[in-house]
Amino acid sequence: MVYNNPWNKIIRRSIKMLVSAKEMLQKAKAGKYAVGQFNINNLEWTKAILQTAQELNSPVILGVSEGAGKYMCGYKTVVGMVNGMIDELGITVPVALHLDHGSYEGCYKCIEAGFSSVMFDGSHYPIAENVAKTTELVKVCAEKGMSLEAEVGAIGGEEDGVVGSGECADPAECKMIADLGVTMLAAGIGNIHGKYPANWKGLSFETLDAVQQQTGDMPLVLHGGTGIPEDMIKKAISLGVAKINVNTECQLAFAAATRGYVEAGKDLQGKGFDPRKLLAPGVEAIKATVKEKMELFGSVNKA
């Protein structure tokens, strides 16, 4: 007698896996839209972004800085959480899990942990050393089926303690790095992380156009997407940007919504102190921000 275990079908079901960002970004570049990278900081952030991507049928990249990775206990914890959510939320859109502004050592840790994409930020190295380290990572990522982002020209502002002045990249250096076989290239074009100051001069489209001419079909990446005017975003996409990073804007929206909940005294009403209730307005604020960005970037219904 063969026992028919009703759980067998569930156990055998295929689980949607993390994907490299390569295919989604090549499609975006060809289709003149951009895929958003939204950085995650905890369970609520991750759930909000994944659910919004699924609702809008949009590909998405979950970014994890080295600082956020440490905050969430480590890269293996992050991979487990994201894979579990993709499965149990029934996420079917393409999802890449990407190390943001990774050190050389950080890239290897994420490769080992199961990320599907990494960024090696070698912009602070001399170009020869940047080339050598990037060349090595290109080979490793290709063997693992992962995507690799490289950077030329330091992005301004501060990213987990890494400070950049907002340089404009040298198009010739961009070509040198692109020719190594990276998946995508972040070129500094006057953009910065965090809030843009009142005296910000704007994006250098002259630099972006020159980089595009030098790198051809290479998907370009725009860091510091928070606060850049919509017309600049659209022009950047028209000049080859296929990936746009958003972090600060989600943080500001989450903080404002959470502050509003507490200041209204809702945490003192009934069981309003329950963290699931206290954090809910912030989660909805993240969803609204991600939706707005996906619509602006043109990635809706592009999964």
Region annotations inferred by a language model:
Residues 37-39, 59-63, 96-98:
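Short, conserved beta-strand segments within well-ordered enzyme catalytic domains
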Residues 229-303:
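C-terminal alpha-helical cap/extension of soluble enzyme domains
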Residues 14-36, 83:
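N-terminal amphipathic alpha-helix/helix-capping segment at the start of soluble metabolic enzymes
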Residues 23-25, 43-67, 77-92, 104-214, ...:
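Alpha/beta enzyme core
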Residues 40, 97-103, 219-230:
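Glycine-rich beta-to-alpha transition loops that act as phosphate-gripper elements at the mouths
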Residues 1-16:
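Short, Lys/Arg-enriched N-terminal segments with co-localized hydrophobic residues
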Residues 68-70, 125-127, 250-255:
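Short gly/pro/ser/thr-enriched loop/turn and capping motifs at secondary-structure boundaries
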Residues 189, 224-226, 248:
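Active-site proximal loops enriched in glycine and acidic residues that flank catalytic Cys/His/Asp
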